[in-house]
Amino acid sequence: MSNTIFPGNTLGIIGINRNGVAMIAAAKKAGFNVGVYVDHSQPEITKMADFTIDGAYNDKQKLTEFGEACDAIIYQTPNIDSTVIRFLGQYAAIPQGINGLEIVQDRLMERAFLDQININIAPYVTVIGLDDVYQSIDSIGYPALLKPIQRGIGEQSMMIKRQSNITRAADFIDTGTYLLESWIDHTAEYTLTAACANGEVEIFPLAQLEYNEDRQLISVASPAEVADDMLQEMHRIIKSVADSLQYTGVFSVNFYVTSTGTLYVKNIELGLTSIANVYDNTTNVDQYEQQLRASVGMPLHVIRQLQTALLMIIRNYQAVAIRRQWLLKNNWKFRFFNNKDKDDPAGILGFVWVTGDTDLNALQNQVDDTEVWNKTLPNSESDNEEQEK
């Protein structure tokens, strides 16, 4: 099927989350009809779509109805089983392809892929039970992360800091194969996001991430500053991934940097991310328009940096404190969500883009002075996007 579609045609979106509102808006602005497939009602996200089909991901009748109503279908996140996307491919074009999705959904395949293109990753072994963990931990070292091979909604990793922790893995390990991976002690985390289509690769400016101890995202800073040779290596890596993954659209590569300056690739993420929302107010084109252009056969925009920004994550428990900044800050831009998880104190309420200075340290000082983000975040069970990948 042709991956070229034109205004007036129908673009389907599956695997939607809070970023879906912006993706639907981008497609509608460009003149496309938009259909959405969800496995549970999300009217706060899908109300802008021309039609919504609510059905299980194994409901072939509903999937067929959706596929036949669309000219092309994209997955917004990689949390949709590749067999579902392959089934939909009988009825509509799948511009992003399936190969990349199958690779990133399987941690072992992803690491084999990264090894094949000579990219530095953490040491790992595969395990299927406690005996394997005991036998392998000496070669991996402490601390280590135990992760299911298959990525998916709701799955988590387990940190093993000492031998006494291994017994707890009996409750964690179910059936199937797991990955035991060295935890890389790092001083910084970065994300590089790119769009690729028809041999073109356009790379967004580097972003630096800040997490709390519970791996909840606090802020995204862009453009992040690193040594020129490290930035060149990051660009080489993301271009190598783009050239080899057989994927069309927006994707990200996440990095660790150690205290000695060693660069490790953490993982590959396909589709749209909350992290890349920083570009909504820092570059001439955002991730949503680039995803749309790649998906419908248009050439990619050449990306240009326009300004420096901090993207701050607003949690529900910060709702009262952020209201004062809403009234005071003329250089802050806000986006709030109609939250279904508003009863979770650590659920994401919205984003703030802090701009107005070319110095990220000055922007951070401005944020620190408000004391909105100085409190310890409550534990959250609702936000799978932030879990260790």
Model-derived segments and spans:
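Structural detector of well-ordered beta-strand residues that form the stable sheet scaffold
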Residues: 35, 74, 94-96, 122, ...
